[in-house]
Structures are given as C-alpha cells and as structure tokens.
Amino acid sequence: MPTHVALLRGINLRPHKRVAMPALRALVEGLGHADVATYIASGNVVFTAGTAESTLADDLEKAIADELGVTCRVVTLSREELARVVADNPYPDEPDPKRVHAIFLTGTAGQAAQKRLTEVQDKLGEKVGRDEARILGRTLYLHTPDGFGRSELAKVLSRPGGPAEGTARNWATVTKLLAMCEPSGTVGS
C-alpha cells in the first residue's frame, strides 16, 4: 500500500478547532489505513492508504467533521509528491528551515494562482521586502528571510480565503514528514 501524508488546515490554533492526535490517529485507522503516525499537533498524518487515492482528502474531511466535530480542509500527498516538493525547493541555500515554507494548495494551482500571487506581490509593493514566493505544481514556496511572523506577504498568503488556498508548513516539518514516509522512518509509531 502506498504511503501518504495528510495535512489538516487550521486545527489546534483556536479553542473551537481542537483535535487530539490520538483521536486523529484512531480516526485515520478507522478509515482502513495502516501505519498511522502523527507529527506535532498541527495536523500532520503519515499513513499507508487502504482506499483510493482520489478520495483520501474528501474522506478525511468528512470523517473529521462527523466524528470529531471539526470542519477543516485536508490536503493529501503521496510520498512521491512530497519527495518532489522537497526536490523542487527553489530556496535550497537558506540555512534556517523555519525561513522557508511550503503552502500546499488545495486543487491545482495553475495560471490563476500564479496571477493572484503576482497581484498580491504588486499590491504589497515595498512591503514584500526580501520575501520571495514561487508556485511549482500544487505548492507555493515562500521564503521569509526576516521571519514568517514579520512577513507581510506571509500574512496575506496565509489568510483564509486568500490567494493561496491551502495549508502551510515550515521546511523543518516538510522534511520530517518525508523522512517519516521512508521505510526506516517512524511510520506506525
């Protein structure tokens, strides 16, 4: 069975969207998946899929809403897709993994997302500072050399309903999740 990663958007940030990781692991196992492991409490799940890949995100969203009472978007990636995201990082020279983020987009990015990104960057003008962003496939890469919390671009891109609909993870989390997908990783623990 292929290994996948599920990324939940916006959980455990506010009191009304709390999800306990043991409950999330049990839910994913209850959907017929195996080798389920979570990483930190921000909604990162690694598992081997027991059902069709095309329905993973929708099935997880529905089960989380029905069983845990939390409505959230879910982005799923195969191990191969996540490996491609890591390989395609346009900012490999940044030594601090917390200065590079991947925003995993829901759906396909395409020209419309690139156009929205350009519009946001143009609107912010000098407020963008040294920040950079690029879309490759279904991933928006965000480089914030002065810090994510200080980035005007990050604030706009991370806003629900903003130009980058998806869920963000810093590079340390992205690479840890890929390591968890490997045969010698911690899947199943």
Language model segments and positions:
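Surface-exposed, charge/polar-rich loops and edge strands
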Residues: 2-189
